[in-house]
Amino acid sequence: VQTRAHDRSDFVTRWPALLARIATAAEAGAKLIVVPEGTVPAYVIGSDPVDPQQIEAAAADVIAVAARTGATIVYGRARAAERGLANSAYVVTPSGIAGYADKCFLWHFDRRWFSAGDALEPVDTPAGRLGVFICADGRIPTIASTLVEKGAEVLVVPTAWVSSGRDPRALENLQADLMIAVRARENGVPLVAANKAGVEARSVAYCGKSQILAADGSVVALAGQDEETTLTGTVAIGPPLVRLGAEPPPVQRLAGDPLPAVLRVAIAAHADPALRASALVADAELVLDPHERPSSSDVALVDDEAMLDPRALVAPRLDGVRLFVWRCSIDAAWAVPFARTRAAELRAYVVAFDTPQRRAFAVDPDGVVICGTFGAFELAAFTFERARTETWRVAPATDVRDALVRVGKITSRAVAP
């Protein structure tokens, strides 16, 4: 259910209509209904205390709908926790509240009124075993993979994907536009994400784009950016299409001196001495091709198995790798999404050599493809900037390195025997 954003002050008047949308979806036969993050009472909480009676009254309404219709409903709400409020997603079945998930990776102003979650556990429901995570948790690859490792059959994402509004006609969000499909495909399970549309508190713009994805990452249903709507779709529930090993596949870290602060790098899709000679045209100080192994401890070589495993690049990146070189032979439609996702979630450069397509391309730490070869254009170049790999902050007070380390501790507990 993609809802129209509301201010906290408007919750009481908006809630009957929101509840009616949930009930209508359930009465139409939906077995699993997902409602956005921060629906009750809102995402932008502010400094005023939350009324627990208001929160519990809304919960009772949702419980009644689930009991009457037989649906499983996942919705975003504030939860009173030991350390203050938690940004939670509650899972409600016909039998009542089955469980909840707290947001682990707080984003930007979340920290002002929420405390971070510290557990990752699937929730059993009549609709399947659900791996629930919230919004920015989707930027940390090991959150979804831990839930699937613990038996989740569907990934469920109540979210509040925001946009800067750079182009009001095409609102952007890296998760909605890129990462969330990779999360489904790399874990091999369906994924359902519900976002808001519109503006909250005159200062938070949502990009819509709620979506239902199949286990291979393909789109079953996708909402637009502006409308309040209910998406419907059918996905297959069963064992994951992907089976991750007990341990992440190895990544080959190279030896040598660190890369300089600024380095011009040329990339070629195939080894050719003549192309290497042409590197002078690009002012390149380093030329990479599928067989070149640069002598630097900042660089690691990655094969398909490691690139597709959401866990494999995390430890090397935390240990100081800044440039991943990938010899790629996967489906061409997924090469760029995986390279972009890994670069953005780990704040690193990725150079990919797509052997079947005879193409090389590079991605920067923001997940942007910054150069690539094609056709007769056989040598492309980019500038490696070490400082960009040292900046882990992706929003105010939102540090990816801190989150990776913190979630690593949570996942270690979660998978411990």
Which role does the model predict for each range below?
Residues V1-A5, G256-D272:
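Short beta-strand segments enriched in small/hydrophobic residues
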Residues T3-H6, A78-A80, K103-C104, C135, ...:
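Active-site beta-loop-alpha junctions enriched in small/polar residues
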Residues R8-I97, W161-V189, A266, H270-L301, ...:
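Cys-nucleophile CN-hydrolase/nitrilase-fold catalytic domain and related Cys-dependent amidase chemistry
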Residues P41, S47, Y90, A101-W107, ...:
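Short beta->alpha transition motifs characteristic of CBS
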Residues I55-V74, R139-E228, L286, D309-E378:
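CN hydrolase (nitrilase-like) catalytic-core segments centered on the catalytic cysteine
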Residues W113-F114, P122, R183, P190-L263, ...:
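C-terminal beta-strand edge segments of enzyme domains
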